Regions:
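Long, contiguous amphipathic alpha-helices that act as assembly "spine/axial" helices in icosahedral shell
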Residues: 87-151, 271-281
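Structured loops at beta-to-helix junctions and adjacent beta-edge loops in soluble globular domains
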Residues: 62, 107, 206-208, 235, ...
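Intrinsically disordered or highly flexible coil/loop and linker segments, enriched in small
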Residues: 40, 44, 136-139, 197-200, ...
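Extended, solvent-exposed, turn-rich assembly/linker loops in the middle of proteins
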Residues: 147-228
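Assembly/oligomerization interface modules of large self-assembling protein complexes
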Residues: 28-100
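N-terminal catalytic cores of peptidoglycan-degrading enzymes
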Residues: 1-54, 267-268
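Sequence/fold signature of self-assembling virion shell proteins
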Residues: 2-11, 15-20, 211-301
Length: 301
């Protein structure tokens, strides 16, 4: 299941405090509406809707040596058997369920006075914080694969996204083979040589790098992205030095033991109502080569 399987459009804007506290699904809808705009975890990983049992998921990382058999198939002659083929099986790994959430209190006075704006701000802050944590964990998972040397890596000696010049003084224009998109093309070629069916569709960078890309390429950028079939996305948890190319259909998975859930309960001694929201994800990298990284040798400070 996804982060919020029953995700619905919340078009009424501000939440009615009493209605929300009586029916927490209203708050769930609001959090889901806010989160879906920036929920990176479901952008870079495929969502697996199968149930999670036992608080963990057993999975394996597939590399090119696991994708084909060690020996080749052979032609069969009449009356013969086909050749027995063998392959190296990847080692099983264990991903444990994580549990992230928070709660806030609404006083009876705020409820009675229908303090809508403060309540909506509290809900929005909780939604933003849960989203931030899930995005942070997604990028930490990707970065761990990079640090372990499992991803497709390219250290490029050409111009960085900040340094590239594609117009202006002809003497200052960066040669085509030294431009960042040349590095992107080389990564695509490397992935194709692996013959694993990888199709990168996300170009993931830091906010500053995204600004540099837009500034450098201007109106030519949409055409370049379309050429490669890429969507440009950014995250605060990406290092300015790194550019990620991701095939979300193959890179990894995210499952939820419990998706986005909101509950509320009375705290009669303090004459207030608690609102609690949480999600319990589990994620893992299943095909590290579906994540590529480009690191430019020269990068302006």
């Amino acid at each position: 299941m996804g982060f919020y399987p029953a995700r619905a459009d919340y078009s009424d804007g501000i939440i009615s405090v009493d209605e929300a506290l009586n029916d927490p699904t209203v708050i769930t809808e609001r959090i889901g509406e806010i989160a879906k705009k920036n929920l990176l975890i479901e952008t870079i990983f495929s969502t697996d809707n199968s149930p999670v049992t036992g608080g963990s998921v057993i999975y394996s990382k597939t590399t090119e040596k696991n994708f084909y058999t060690d020996n080749d198939v052979t032609q069969r002659q009449p009356g013969d058997e086909y050749t027995v083929v063998y392959r190296e099986r990847p080692e099983a790994e264990l991903a444990r369920v994580e549990d992230y959430g928070g709660k806030f209190a609404v006083s009876d006075e705020a409820r009675r006075r229908n303090n809508e704006i403060d309540f909506d701000n509290d809900v929005t802050a909780l939604a933003n914080t849960i989203t931030r944590k899930l995005n942070q964990r997604a990028l930490e998972t990707v970065k761990a694969a990079y640090d372990a040397g499992e991803t497709v890596k390219l250290v490029d000696g050409g111009a960085s996204w900040a340094d590239v010049r594609i117009d202006g003084n002809p003497a200052e224009i960066t040669p085509a083979r030294q431009r960042p998109f040349s590095a992107v093309a080389n990564v695509f070629a490397s992935a194709e040589k692996l013959d694993l069916g990888i199709e990168y569709s996300k170009l993931l960078v830091s906010p500053q790098t995204k600004a540099n890309i837009i500034s450098s390429y201007g109106t030519t950028l949409p055409g370049l992205l379309d050429t490669f079939g890429l969507e440009l996305i950014s995250s605060n948890y990406v290092d300015d030095r790194l550019t990620y190319l991701i095939d979300p259909g193959k890179a990894g998975f995210v499952k939820y033991e419990e998706p986005l859930t909101v509950t509320s309960w009375r705290d009669e001694p303090h004459r207030q109502t608690w609102v609690q929201g949480y999600a319990m994800p589990v994620m893992g990298i299943t095909l590290p080569a579906a994540i590529a990284t480009i690191e430019f040798a020269e990068l302006d400070a």
